[in-house]
Amino acid sequence: MGDVEKGKKIFIMKCSQCHTVEKGGKHKTGPNLHGLFGRKTGQAPGYSYTAANKNKGIIWGEDTLMEYLENPKKYIPGTKMIFVGIKKKEERADLIAYLKKATNE
């Protein structure tokens, strides 16, 4: 399991320009991530997803996020997420630990 505090710093630096995590948070360029774990791809209410995201049909969890965050465009070809990914597994684990906590509060 990753480090929540390190993950928060990664989120602020690499994700917060496009995403929010708090309950009731607004969508930005990317969707609000509250309730992410256990939700199917392309399902945040009120956000306009690409068909690729909606049709991927996986459930977000630690394993799926670990793979997705390494290279989003490879994992979901056709996604509009422009983020190149996080190559270091430890950094992805830290970010996932933070997301698991922050998107469930």
UniProtKB/Swiss-Prot annotation:
The modification N6-succinyllysine is found at K56, K73. Keywords: Acetylation, Apoptosis, Disease variant, Electron transport, Heme, Iron, Metal-binding, Mitochondrion, Phosphoprotein, Respiratory chain, Transport. The keyword Translocase does not apply. The modification Phosphotyrosine is found at Y49, Y98. Heme c binds at C15, C18, H19, M81. The modification N6-acetyllysine is found at K73, K100. Changing F11Y: No effect on covalent heme attachment. The modification N-acetylglycine is found at G2. It is found in: Mitochondrion intermembrane space. Pfam families: Cytochrom_C. GO terms for cellular component: apoptosome; cytosol; mitochondrial inner membrane; mitochondrial intermembrane space; mitochondrion; nucleus. Changing G42S: In THC4; increases the pro-apoptotic function by triggering caspase activation more efficiently than wild-type; does not affect the redox function. GO terms for molecular function: electron transfer activity; heme binding; metal ion binding. PANTHER family: CYTOCHROME C (PTHR11961). Electron carrier protein. The oxidized form of the cytochrome c heme group can accept an electron from the heme group of the cytochrome c1 subunit of cytochrome reductase. Cytochrome c then transfers this electron to the cytochrome oxidase complex, the final protein carrier in the mitochondrial electron-transport chain. It is linked to Thrombocytopenia 4: A form of thrombocytopenia, a hematologic disorder defined by a decrease in the number of platelets in circulating blood, resulting in the potential for increased bleeding and decreased ability for clotting. This is Cytochrome c.
